[in-house]
Amino acid sequence: MLADVAAASTEVAASSARLVKIERIATLLARSAAEDDTQAVAVIVSWLSGELPQRQIGVGWAALRTLPPPAATPSLTVDDVDDRLSTIKAVAGKGSQATRAGLVHELFSAATDPEQKFLRHLLSGELRQGALAGVMADAVAKAAGLPAAEIRRAAMLAGNLPAVAAAAVTGGRAALADFRLRVGRPVGPMLAQTATSVDDALQRLGGTAVLEAKLDGARVQIHRSGCDVSIYTRSLDDVTHRLPEVVEATLALPATELIADAEAIALRPDGRPHLFQVTAARFGRKDPGDLGPLSVFFFDLLHVDGRDLLDLPTEERFGALDALVRQDQRVDRLVTTDTVAAQEFLERTLAAGHEGVMAKSPHAAYEAGRRGAGWLKVKPVHTLDLVVLAVEWGSGRRQGKLSNIHLGARDPDSSGFVMLGKTFKGMTDAMLEWQTQRFLELADGPTDGYVVHLRPEQVVEIAFDGVQRSSRYPAGMALRFVRVLRYRDDKSPAEADTVETVRRFYERD
């Protein structure tokens, strides 16, 4: 029942103890397995991970702002809600927005108050309860009675923990045999931790690192079997039909079968990268014909002609890649033990218009779907002093705290502020306590709604990775990957950074 999931979500969010979270989720999964409901197991894992199996269903916060009166008693099952969400996603054509709104109203009319709260947080992307991938994998293992390492390995190779959970909890160890590296089935990409500098990276990697240019493009995973090529994004969406140049480049390689990591990027005639949005536009179009070409640069090889390379060290995988792909189609690379040489490589990469560098251990295996210690990213940190324009009430562990802040830059022309994004990243518990009290004092209107609007008086220093084009905000720009560093009580709003300062970052990016 949906009521059971909502109750479990509340309990998981209320606890900071990892073992308590694992036990509560495992109990819920085991109950669904006992009812032989494989679909429900997969859906529950998705939901409690804060995700929808349908990914996006075309329902924004506006449709969730005003809800119908809740039902008195629970009646919705997990499968019923999942089917309804699939129906909402499938709505298209003229009048689709109104149709979706009607279907959302019907769904919420059938939900009790706790169920409505759960669904609203889930659909708005605000279900933050501390049930991260590691916790969820351990909960699946406990429910299935299997070692967590087996669940993680299967999820790594499947790129899909919900599917692994459904198989393991209902079918046991034998059901995991199907989850192996397979051409045509994407795996979760290996992710990088962050290093503060190339010197920090070298030290953490034991003194020797393989440095790579970190291109500001779109990461893709490429699968080839004979003449068939499939291309997936880092979130495992199939974008093959949107990237014909990548298909062509892959078919030109001297291999029959392969799985490779690569970066697709739009380059200017002089070889410098276009703005990230130019590359990203290709991933949002069904017909790429009216947009510029993309280049592809390979940087890792997971499988080639019947041979799995996942568990091999970096240097061996790169050796296999070098034997397969021409140098001008590979990401620039330097193996070094020298901090000066590493810093020069970083500076050359930045001067060429790229994001920074990746530093990789020559001995690390490919940890698919994990943020491994063998990969470190080094990028310059940009900071801005902005003004908090509004703030949202939190959920889960942040229930009762003002959490997600709306950020604005100063606009000298209008003597006001222009919104550039939102963030709840980087906030400590002490900071949440402080800002809740502070922002209630600055409230400019009611404080019982989801969003509390503020008098623009509080300056905050934030770090960000870049600026991208956005139609969501009046300035046409949005900050990327924003984190709070500290509140600047020593600065007045008149000292906040201007829209023009942000625009210079945008033009440079």
From Swiss-Prot:
UniProt EC number: 6.5.1.1
Gene3D superfamilies attached to this UniProt entry: DNA ligase, ATP-dependent, N-terminal domain, DNA ligase/mRNA capping enzyme, Nucleic acid-binding proteins
Residues that, per the record, bind ATP: E212, R219, R234, E263, F299, R371, K377
Active site: K214 (n6-amp-lysine intermediate)
Reported phenotype of the disruption mutant: Not essential for growth, no effect on NHEJ. In quadruple ligB-ligC1-ligC2-ligD deletions NHEJ on blunt and 5'-overhangs is 0.22 and 0.12% of wild-type respectively; only 4-fold decrease in 3'-overhang NHEJ.
Catalysis performed (reactions): ATP + (deoxyribonucleotide)n-3'-hydroxyl + 5'-phospho-(deoxyribonucleotide)m = (deoxyribonucleotide)n+m + AMP + diphosphate
Residues of the signal peptide: none
GO molecular function, one term: DNA ligase (ATP) activity
Superkingdom in the source lineage: Bacteria
Keyword Chloroplast: no
Coiled coil ranges: none
Keyword terms, alphabetized: ATP-binding, Cell cycle, Cell division, DNA damage, DNA recombination, DNA repair, DNA replication, Ligase, Magnesium, Metal-binding, Nucleotide-binding
Family membership: Belongs to the ATP-dependent DNA ligase family.
The name this protein goes by in its record: DNA ligase B
